[in-house]
Amino acid sequence: MEPGQYYEGELDDMPPQYAKTREANPDYTNYREEGGQGLHGFHSHLHDEVDLRRSLACYYGMVSLIDQEVGRILDTLDRLGIAEETLVLFSTDHGHYLGQHGLIAKGAFHYEDLLRIPMVVRYPGLVPAGARCDALQCQVDWPVTFLSAAGIPVPGLMQGLNQLPLWSGDADQARNAGRRHLRARLSAASPYLRIKG
């Protein structure tokens, strides 16, 4: 895999804080997020290809380590004889930029690279091994799905959707929309407010 890259002009229609990441020493002193949130990701993202390749190698090393450790967890479930009755979900809270759009790490830049994250589910007897699913799912669905799998009534105040029918292949989708929250000053009149789909 090659490091991602920035394409000239791709930030032309984006909020100004996006383009500042292409500067060597951007000034974010006048930028504030609501609620006193930090400016995570608001810095220069200029890196040479050697640094990007080093970051990519480090990232792959971390992925390999996580793969090894998840394997140990699954082996332990097998050894204890509870693998067949245990729902395992492995995922993350966000993606990671490795040069895509000229960005590194993460931050308040909501491209698909940050939002479309992997998820692996193992639930023998219900979720077919090796099955793939491209349906939209949200992390808010996980607690509802876990309660449903355990046969525990879902409290009415929980807003997630049960994903078990989707994971088992009995449904094509559980939801047709999701929401990702960005703490920034945008209004309905903002030229930077975008809705895709």
Regions found by a protein language model. Name each.
Residues M1-E85, L89-L136, A149-I152, G156:
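Active-site-proximal cap/lid insertion segments
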Residues H94-Q100, V140-P143, S148-G197:
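C-terminal cap/loop subdomain of S1 sulfatases and analogous C-terminal strand-loop tails that border
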